Swiss-Prot record:
GO terms for molecular function: 3'-5' exonuclease activity; DNA binding; DNA-directed DNA polymerase activity. Its EC number is 2.7.7.7. Required for replicative DNA synthesis. This DNA polymerase also exhibits 3' to 5' exonuclease activity. This is DNA polymerase III PolC-type. The keyword Transferase applies. NCBIfam families: dnaq, polC_Gram_pos, PRK00448.1. GO terms for biological process: DNA-templated DNA replication. It catalyses: DNA(n) + a 2'-deoxyribonucleoside 5'-triphosphate = DNA(n+1) + diphosphate. SMART domains: EXOIII, POLIIIAc. Its main location: cytoplasm. The gene is polC. It is found in: Cytoplasm. GO terms for cellular component: cytoplasm.
Length: 1463
């Protein structure tokens, strides 16, 4: 046997007689694969023959036992050089194959393990009854059996089943005999039960049928109460009659074409998860299984089989029942329950799971009178917490866990005036067994005494700590037990080192650690602490070279070329630090003129040295309303002015805003904990004076410090906790037991694990322990929300009395000092604009008089009066006026502004120019004499659809307008809903419109609306798969989905609304409402955003939606090209309306352009979905186009609803429900009271029709039926989930028709504008190659799309090519890119041809395109080299241009220029 195999045999302790067996004579280890994360050692052995089974089993046992001692697992595979074997040996291995792995499935094993097998060549014959001859076993199990035997050294078998009729008959007879016994036993049991019942039951009061079918059915239903439950994680293959118990986390019902219902649901028992499916006859039967719902606990029985569709194991459920699941409860009596003062919500970035509502609800459920929230560096959970606490009737204490830093970290300690160049320095370093001067030991002190850059003496002593060094210490420092075993005693080394350092300046890299360690040891041995000057080269480097990212000893020595042979051995570190010191001294004198030691702290420390300062955690709580505003200021400052990697709060800034705040000492990252561990109780008492209370946490929270070897063991950890309590007692400050909550339930730990590990090893929390193959991240603490009794158990080591004081008494007492605060205002606070009310009223009437005359028609006058009463009475005038000012400024820059949402429901908004949608009932009006005529009977859905008519007074052609939209849909029935005015500005003009807001209201009052980005479902799925890969896990699909659900929703980043701007009233400041920050922590951003998600404060402050949109840009481009005023374009143009019914108006056939209508490229109507709707409905009026717009944007309004009604001929496009406002208008025309019509509309549009009480719904239905509203209309209401506002539809359709007007009447302008603004992808070679090439490329992409193989770019390109194809079919062409004619970003018209811009070329971006045009204006390009240099083009782009024939005969180099240079 080989040496390696012999060593393994010795290690395993294999018996001598086995080692000498002939089978092992030529044994060899071919290779060993070590899976570090899963701790699996995979051996690959080579033997001369297949091993005798007894040797195989001994080897297997030895490997298993030996490796399990170290927490590892060993598996092995065998190759046999000779594969000769007897059927007897085969039979032995055949049985062994079922002992583990995929063949251990209970169903497969029970049928197959005891069968007889034989081999003939590579065929393995298995003899058994008919029961084993199943396709399922052949397909899914026999291949696994063959693989298992191959691992034992056998050849690759093809497994065949041989049916044995005798065995089949024997099995059937045994089954029937067993079945008869079961039936007989059941009957006897039933008879005994009936006899007992007859004896117990009273005589029947009345006769009943002799046979009760329902009773029998109920009795026959299987009970699962006593069934054996199988943990889901144990099921890896198909098995029958298994019972699972778990919680449902996903449910979906599907109705098949035959009417059967499939209930797909997923359950977890927290060991793993499983997909389930339950078939039922019909929807009525499905209602009996409504117990299958999210968060319900079920016990289910069924067969686990491979689902051919999902390719995953799925249980086909036969029986199920709901079970009562034990929930953790707080078992302490009322009045003796704790208050949690340290809980994180999902707003702690990538760190914690629960929404604040869950924390509040859990505390309330457990009977806790209060709970505190303390997210990392932010307060984004405050608004939701405020509402949740009010709802739950519990006190919420508002706090955060802040990152505190020192403003100025000294370079020199104990500074004196001294010439830096004349001082003698002792540059020293210490090596220790840990970070604590109290609990760890010095093991080496080394120093270099230096003068003028030269080493004049050296000190280097090891110290025996009195115990063996840990592997971690040896691995880190290189110091072994041999180094220290004969070393001097510590006290002697300390005395000698003090003597060595006399009359010198001490120097260390990260001096606070080294000096702290030395002082603690000096003090312990009654030696004087360090009093001479100390220079910290770490801070020296940070202030001298702030541009460097890393200032550790390793990176600095590498940068300056200083030798560092053995980092973390004190003698080498000390000498390297000394070399760096003299480089720094020279540099600081030359660059900063500093030559005196005492001036280093004065002249060199940077004002932003806080950026590199060490962060310490502290918990800050809001005591009162003053404190709330101060914490808002601190959050703002830390996220803006002092942001560096994380939000930082300099100590002096905290001091300046401390009024109304309470400070806690936080976790193990807090400075009190740190100083207790590193310097002891006395030092910690001084530090703790800064805080109002001291936090101690359960040992389980601190436990990872043991794994990191920062704390020796649990006993030392308990000592540290006792020391923290002593600190509080000495100062008379309360000590509170807090839980550092990061999730609610213990089983949720895995979700946080997945989130945290997704951050990678760059995150501090994921820093690995150990080195090389043993490196792994430290475990995370058990940070679930603990009940009072659980918390008392954690602190039982303190004794009952002290534990109760920390857990219950102190937390409740501290909670009493917090006052109630108003986090979210109860009212709307709009900015002040002088005379806003008068201006809005004046502008409204001025425009109304101009259009409708003075006096106004009653219908106009009453509408204005109604609206102004609401707008002015509720303080909304400033919102209207601000929007009007923004629109006016954009109009003056030459852009139309489109409205969104319901603002078009307001006639005042129309009159002052915010929207062009006129919400009055359809009407005529004369522009000459102001004659008007209103149609109020509902006969027209839009004024644009009325026939043309001349003025009866003056003969002038009448204008037509009015979309019949009630004002109530904008501000509510009582007109007191805060208006949400959304405006679509041109994307080109949007930045200017944003600056207009600042200009109108002031920069300090205008902020972008902030958003919070959380981990999305797909991202969470990726995190789970990454965790699975990195940590050697194997999850089935259902478990991946469960874990992804648990990991989703955690804050990941912040952002800003694309157009939302929040305006703070100028008589208040932003901190009255929200903190501020930069989006995504980008401190270079032009705008600050609200810290709170803008939805949390949108009812308190004005939010303007200044959005960017392509439509206004398109209209501006078309106006520039044509000179046509877009406001003069008619809304009832016959040619435009013809687009919706065919292609004739374009001069092409449907076959030419691949669609039956002319909708391609028309906003709102050009998508495949809407084009299909157009094909089905053939709209002919503006009102019907509004219907289409509403139907296409709603949910369950078209599909399965209006579409079916139209197909069945029950209704047509004009009568189905399309927009939300239609419901109110239709019902009022039908005769319902306006209030009821409005309420019905609100219930339907929000999808609440089937969710309201049956009594309320029946009341509405009766009223509708009484007014002859048809049954189909009422049923349609019940299906709707969401509806589009009519005003929004009207604004969009008006813009769309303007664009369509140019497509019909000015096509070259239309195509130029479309490709310049809307097209997303180009292939200019194809676009210019003619129809045949274009159509062929479209077919290629279409085929890819059918197979889901098309990329997003190709999908966008297909849309472009549809328009390109149409343009060519209409007789227009594309030219080539022209180096001297093409524009940077816009297409150019040349007769009937479009010249593409440079950005249409693949790989050529907008900035380069603009640079190329600028360079072209400077003069002709004489060579390709010059084109690359002046035009900023890459060689690849120049080559592409040359291939496309754009460069003509341009030479590679400019020969004339070369000639000029020579002479």
């Amino acid at each position: 046997m080989s040496n390696s195999f012999e060593i393994l045999m010795n290690q395993l302790g294999m018996p001598a007689e086995m080692r000498q067996a002939p089978a092992l004579a030529q044994a060899n280890i071919e290779r060993v694969v070590v899976h570090k994360i899963s701790k699996v050692w995979e051996f690959h052995f080579v033997f001369s023959n297949i091993l005798p089974i007894e040797i195989f089993l001994e080897l297997k046992k030895g490997l298993s036992e030996e490796f399990s001692k170290t927490g590892n697992k060993a598996v092995f595979e065998i190759k046999a050089r000779s594969q000769e074997f007897s059927n007897q040996l085969l039979q032995s291995y055949y049985r062994e194959a079922f002992s583990e792995g995929p063949c251990a499935s209970q169903g497969f094993k029970s049928l197959y393990q005891n069968l007889q097998v034989r081999a003939e060549g590579n065929q393995l014959f298995i003899e058994g009854s008919e029961a084993i001859d199943k396709e399922h076993f052949k397909k899914n199990h026999l291949p696994n059996l063959a693989k298992q035997l191959e691992k034992f050294g056998f050849p690759t078998f093809n497994c065949q089943v041989e049916k044995n009729d005798v065995l089949t008959q024997e099995q059937e007879e045994a089954f029937h005999a067993e079945n008869e016994q079961i039936v007989q036993a059941a009957n006897e049991e039933a008879l005994r039960a009936m006899e007992q019942l007859e004896q117990m039951a009273p005589p029947p009061a009345e006769e009943k049928p002799a046979f009760d079918f329902q009773a029998k059915k109920a009795a026959a239903k299987p009970k699962l109460d006593k069934a054996e439950i199988t943990p889901m994680i144990e099921v890896t293959t198909e098995e029958n009659r298994l019972v699972f118990e778990g919680v449902v986390f996903d449910v979906e019902q599907k109705v098949t074409r035959t009417g059967r219902v499939l209930i797909n649901f997923k359950m977890t028992d927290y060991t793993s998860s499983f997909s389930m499916q339950k078939w039922v006859k019909n929807e009525e039967e499905a209602q009996k299984f409504d117990l299958i719902k999210k968060n319900s606990w079920l016990r289910v029985r069924g067969n686990v089989e491979m689902n051919n569709f999902t390719r995953d194991l799925t249980m086909n459920v036969q029986d199920l029942q709901e079970v009562v699941h034990y929930e953790r409860k707080d078992l302490m009596p009322e009045g003796e329950r704790r208050v949690e003062f340290h809980a994180h919500t999902n707003m702690s970035t990538m760190d914690a799971l629960p929404e604040v509502e869950e924390i509040v609800a859990t505390a309330a459920k457990w009977g806790h009178k209060a709970v505190a929230i303390t997210d990392h560096g932010n307060v984004q959970s405050f608004p939701h917490g405020y509402k949740a606490a009010k709802k739950a009737g519990i006190q919420l204490i508002y706090g955060m866990e802040a990152n505190i830093v020192e403003d100025r970290v000294p370079i020199v300690y104990n500074e004196v005036e001294m010439d830096l160049s004349e001082a003698t320095y002792v540059v020293f370093d210490v090596e220790t067994t840990g970070l604590s001067a109290i609990y760890n030991d010095l093991i080496q002190v080394a120093a270099s005494k230096m003068y003028k850059g030269n080493v004049i003496a050296e000190f280097d002593e090891f110290i025996n700590p009195g115990h063996p060094l840990s592997a971690f210490t040896t691995e880190l420092t290189g110091i072994t037990d041999d180094h220290v075993k004969n070393a001097k005693p510590l006290e002697q080394v300390l005395q000698e080192f003090q003597e060595f350092c006399k009359d010198t300046v001490l120097v260390a890299h990260n001096a606070t650690f080294d000096v702290g360690f030395m002082n603690a040891n000096y003090e312990r041995h009654d030696l004087p602490k360090i009093s001479q000057p100390v220079i910290d080269t770490l801070e020296f480097a940070r202030n001298l070279y702030p541009e460097y990212k890393r200032h550790g000893l390793g990176p600095l020595t590498k940068r300056f070329g200083v030798a560092l042979e053995h980092h973390h051995m004190a003698n080498y570190d000390a000498e390297a630090t000394g070399r760096l010191l003299f480089i720094f001294i020279k540099e600081v004198a030359e660059k900063h003129g500093v030559t005196d030691l005492a001036r280093l702290n004065i002249d060199l420390i940077s004002p932003d040295s806080y950026k590199k300062a060490r962060i310490k955690h502290a918990t800050i709580y809001v005591k009162n309303q003053v404190g709330l505003k101060n914490i808002f200021k601190l959050v703002s400052l830390s996220n803006t002015k002092y942001f560096e990697g994380v939000p930082r709060i300099p100590r002096t800034v905290l001091d300046a805003h401390r009024e109304g705040l309470i400070l806690g000492s936080a976790c193990s990252e807090g400075e009190v904990f740190d100083v207790v561990v590193s310097q002891g109780v006395d030092a910690a008492v001084e530090v703790a004076k800064y805080y109002d209370f001291i936090e101690v946490m359960p040992p389980a929270i601190y436990a990872p410090l043991i794994a990191k070897e920062q704390v020796k063991d649990m006993e030392e950890l308990q000592t540290i906790i006792k020391s923290l309590i002593e600190v509080g007692d000495r100062l008379g400050k309360p000590v509170l037991a807090t839980g550092n909550v990061h999730y609610i339930e213990p089983e949720e730990e895995i979700y946080r694990e997945i989130i945290v590990r997704s951050l990678g090893q760059g995150a501090m929390i994921n820093r690995t322990i150990g080195h090389g193959e043993h490196a792994q991240p430290a475990p995370l603490p058990k940070a679930h929300f603990r009940t009072t009794n659980e918390m008392l158990d954690e602190f039982a080591f303190l004794g009952e009395e002290l534990a109760r004081k920390l857990v219950i008494e102190n937390t409740n007492a501290l909670a009493e000092i917090f006052e109630s605060v108003e986090v979210v205002k109860g009212d709307l606070y709009t900015p002040f604009i002088d005379k806003a009310e008068e201006t809005v009223a004046e502008l409204t009437y001025k425009k109304a008089f101009e259009i409708y005359g003075n006096p106004l028609p009653d219908i106009v006058d009453l509408r204005i009066e109604k609206e102004l009463t609401s707008i002015l009475g509720n303080g909304f005038a400033v919102i209207y006026l601000a929007s009007q000012m923004l629109v006016q400024r954009s109009n003056e820059r030459g852009y139309l502004v489109g409205s969104r949402g319901s603002v078009g429901s307001s006639f005042v908004a129309t009159m002052i120019g915010i929207t062009e949608v006129n919400p009055l009932s359809p009407h005529y009006v004369c522009g000459q004499c102001q004659y008007s005529e209103f149609i109020t009977d509902g006969s027209y859905g839009s004024g644009f659809d009325m026939p043309h008519k001349d003025c009866p007074n003056c003969g002038h052609k009448l204008s037509k307008n009015g979309q019949d939209i009630p004002f109530e849909t904008f501000l509510g029935f009582d007109g007191d809903k805060v208006p949400d005015i959304d405006l679509n500005f041109s994307g080109e003009d949007q930045p200017s419109a944003h600056l207009d807001v600042r200009d109108i209201f002031g920069e300090e009052y205008a902020f972008r609306a902030g958003t919070v980005g959380t981990v999305a479902a797909k991202t969470a799925y990726g995190f789970v798969k990454g965790y699975e890969r990195d940590y050697g896990k194997f999850y089935r699909d259902a478990e991946v989905e469960r874990l992804a659900q648990g990991a989703a929703g955690v804050k990941r980043t912040t952002g800003q609304h694309p157009g939302g701007i929040v305006v703070i009233p100028n008589y208040m400041d932003v901190y009255d409402f929200t903190p501020v920050q930069y989006p995504a922590d980008d401190v270079t951003a032009e705008w600050q955003t609200t810290h709170f998600n803008f939805h949390d404060i949108d009812e308190n402050v004005l939010k303007l939606d200044v959005l960017g949109h392509d439509d206004p840009t398109m209209i501006r481009k078309l106006q520039d090209l044509s000179g046509i005023d877009p406001n003069k374009i008619p809304m009832d143009d016959e040619g435009v309306m013809a687009l919706f019914s065919g292609t004739d108006v374009l001069g092409v056939t449907p076959e030419q352009i691949g669609t039956p209508t002319g909708m391609l490229g028309i906003p709102e109507f050009g998508t495949n979905f809407v084009r299909g709707m157009v094909d089905e409905t053939h709209p002919t009026t503006f009102a019907e186009l509004l219907q289409l717009s509403g139907l296409s944007h709603g949910t369950d309004v078209w599909l399965g609803n209006a579409q079916d009604l139209i197909k069945q001929g029950i209704a047509d496009l004009s009568t189905v429900i399309g927009c939300r406002d239609d419901i109110m208008v239709y019902l009022m025309h039908a005769g319902l009271e306006p209030k009821m019509a409005f309420t019905i509309m609100e219930r339907v549009r929000k999808g609440l029709w089937l969710k309201i009480s049956e009594e309320e719904r029946n009341g509405y239905i009766e009223a509708m039926k009484a007014n002859k509203v048809p049954e189909w209309y009422i049923e349609s209401c019940g299906k709707i989930k969401y509806m589009f506002p009519k005003a929004h539809a009207a604004a969009y359709v008006m813009m769309a028709l303007r664009v369509a007007y140019f497509k019909v009447h000015h096509p070259i302008y239309y195509y130029c504008a479309y490709f310049s603004i809307r097209a997303k992808a180009f292939d200019i070679k194809t676009m210019g190659a003619g129809l045949e090439v274009i159509k062929r490329r479209m077919e290629e992409i279409s085929e890819k799309r059918k197979n889901n193989e098309a990329s997003n770019v190709e999908i966008d390109l297909y849309t472009t090519l549809e328009i390109v194809n149409e343009m060519w079919e209409r007789g227009f062409k594309f030219g080539k890119l022209d180096l001297y004619c093409s524009q940077a970003t816009e297409f150019l018209i040349d007769g009937d041809t479009l010249i593409p811009p440079f950005v249409a070329m693949d790989g050529l971006g907008e900035n380069v395109a603009k640079q190329l045009v600028r360079a072209r204006e400077e003069g002709e390009f004489l060579s390709k080299t010059e084109l690359r240099k002046r035009g900023g083009l890459s060689s690849t782009l120049v080559e592409k241009m040359d291939e496309m024939g754009i460069l003509g005969n341009m030479p590679e180099d400019n020969q004339l220029s070369l000639f000029d240079e020579l002479f």
